[in-house]
Each structure stands twice: as C-alpha cells, then as structure tokens.
C-alpha cells in the first residue's frame, strides 16, 4: 500500500498569534455589517491596512493567518462576501473600517496577551 502524502503543516514563526479565547469573544458579537442579524458569527481576519509597525510574524502571509488581534465578527454570508469581492471593496461597500473595529474588539478582549499586543502597536 502506498503511503499517503500530506502537506507539511505551516509553521508560524515568532511568538504565538492564535488566541482561541479571543476569537470566541469576537464570535459572541453581532455581524459587523449594520442591520445584519444573521448567524452563525465567524471571526474574520483583517489582512489589508495593518499598522506599519506590525511585526512580520503577526502579518500573516501565504499559508498563514494574521495575528488573532486582527479579527472582526461577520456572519457566514458576509464572511464569504468579504473573500469574494475583496477586503477593501467589502469595507467600502458597507462603509466599515475593518481594522479599527478589529482593534477596538482586541482592546476589550478577555485575553491579556491580545490587549498587550495591541498596546504595543500604538
């Protein structure tokens, strides 16, 4: 029998960037799109317009997600829409500053490390 080939797991270089407790906190909010009451809510990562002093390890990249402090809540429909039309078009269409919303949630996070990371960016 042939051995099944699997892709190697992508490794995140640098300090920890995944905070499941923070993502759960974000999923506890309503969809970021005004007037939307759909669910379930997903934690969506912001990739565009990150602060210039964001360390490389927290920016994400090919096969890597950005730091979990850069997440905002969206229902499944709007999360798919964000990927389909692009992050900047999605933000312009709904008149939302995704980064500002994500950082606002990160400042109120129940995870001290997330709050500390956001403070280091300002």
Regions found by a protein language model. Name each.
Residues 46, 51-66:
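Short, surface-exposed loop/helix-turn segments at secondary-structure junctions
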Residues 26, 45, 75:
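Divalent metal-coordination and catalytic microenvironments
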